[in-house]
Amino acid sequence: MRIPLVLALALASAFAVLPSLASAGVPCGICNSTVPLCVTLVGAAGDAPAAEFGEFVVIMRDLANNPIAGAMVVIDLSNAPDMHFCADQMDPTMTVDCANNRVSKVTAADGSVHFTLLGGSNGAGNASTLLNGGMIFANGVLLQYPTVAAYDLDGSGGVGANDVSALLGDFGLGQPFGRCDYDCSGKVGANDLSLWLKAYGSGTMTRSCGSSCP
């Protein structure tokens, strides 16, 4: 089958710009970059975020697989009304934009940036966001729609009995609410309860947000 001349020229032009895009450091979230499918909001104990249960890394690479240093990586919860960030993320390198329910950090020389996100949800019976409710951007390019979970499901008093009540309530509804999908399986089940109990038993999330983003 012959390729029409116009289409052939268009394809040639597209491939011709790939090297220049790569050298310009254009993020490639669907090929070379490392971006999580799921992220989990955690609490803190004193001034120590529970990194063990929530830390993740984003690694930015361009089309030539080169690391992109100085890229602005944004975690956006504006499409997840039942989830919130803490106004204080206990991370001096993180910028918090409460008005738009998002946070951001800048990648290091190797293209990586580490996040431990402090935040929670809005209590039993109030879940509304299903899977893939968050957004991750780098330099304005949308890279991923991650599922967003939270251990502090009522957003008050640290991780405790009210939170497990909310988890069981979400499970009983049979809906894949993202806030309880701790194992990133796409559903709420027994393993999520096990992971919640492990987080609770660790004693690392005794503190909720002092002030929450709207």
Q: Where are the predicted features?
A:
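Positively charged n-region of N-terminal signal peptides that target proteins for export
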Residues: 1-4
